[in-house]
Amino acid sequence: MPELPEVETVRKGLERLVVNQEIASITIKVPKMVKTDLNDFMISLPGKTIQQVLRRGKYLLFDFGEMVMVSHLRMEGKYLLFPNKVPDNKHFHLYFKLTNGSTLVYQDVRKFGTFELVRKSSLKDYFTQKKLGPEPTADTFQFEPFSKGLANSKKPIKPLLLDQRLVAGLGNIYVDEVLWAAKIHPQRLANQLTESETSLLHKEIIRILTLGIEKGGSTIRTYKNALGEDGTMQKYLQVYGKTGQPCPRCGCLIKKIKVGGRGTHYCPRCQCL
């Protein structure tokens, strides 16, 4: 699943490709992917111009002025822009024909991606209802609320970080990475972390997600940005996907276990339970 660095990289590519472009028509091959009123979706966007492409957590926000199209890539979603003819592909599900003759296509092998049309004035309430936490930046991701959230939870730390309430944008890859960096076992109960562990974890979340954005995200399986390029963050991962390889810090072999139903990579020596 694309996580925050990957989605931000897609956003940057879309910003270059489609901002200030007007929608001429829309074709939807898989109607179930549109989670708001389908007819409203079909008639509201043609004639509108993409003013900005923004991001909140793992959500892409196409700003059309009064309305915003909220897009979630889920497991395999990606956007492609074709300047002329669009090739046949059974995994192309939404087509946004632009007035300049090009077509923005949404591709999704799993068909898990979602689209919603939301009034811009309702966007804050939309994300409040989803209980989406702050962006992982030094300005918005404050230590005190994060520390309090951990102290009040009896959940293991990994599932808690994955649920997006304390901080937005973390997925399986980057949770493994930040927990390794902070030397915290993924099964540790959140309310058992010390203040120093919580402080280090907070700093590493900001540092690693920022690095992920700088490196264009991680291409592990199929991820590419909107320009068709691979990310390079996979070259900087320390534990994710490294089962049986030496820990870069201590040399102990990396192990993989299940935590909350998710495959989880950690160092048994650095991250004691």
Swiss-Prot record:
Entry's EC annotation: 3.2.2.23, 4.2.99.18
Per the record, the domain of life is Bacteria
Give the matching Gene3D superfamilies: 1.10.8.50, MutM-like, N-terminal (3.20.190.10)
The cross-references to InterPro entries, in alphabetical order and at most eight, read:
DNA_glyclase/AP_lyase_DNA-bd, DNA_glyclase_Znf_dom_DNA_BS, Formamido-pyr_DNA_Glyclase, FPG_cat, MutM-like_N-ter, Ribosomal_uS13-like_H2TH, Znf_DNA_glyclase/AP_lyase, Znf_FPG/IleRS
Q: Please list the residues that bind DNA.
A: 91, 110
List UniProt keywords, sorted A-Z: DNA damage, DNA repair, DNA-binding, Glycosidase, Hydrolase, Lyase, Metal-binding, Multifunctional enzyme, Zinc, Zinc-finger
Gene Ontology terms describing biological process: base-excision repair
Zn finger region (FPG-type):
238-272
Listed SMART domains: Fapy_DNA_glyco (SM00898), H2TH (SM01232)
The protein's assembly and partners: Monomer.
Identify the NCBIfam families for this entry: fpg, PRK01103.1
Question: Which PANTHER family does the record match to this protein?
Answer: FORMAMIDOPYRIMIDINE-DNA GLYCOSYLASE
| Descriptive protein name | Formamidopyrimidine-DNA glycosylase
Gene name in the database record: mutM
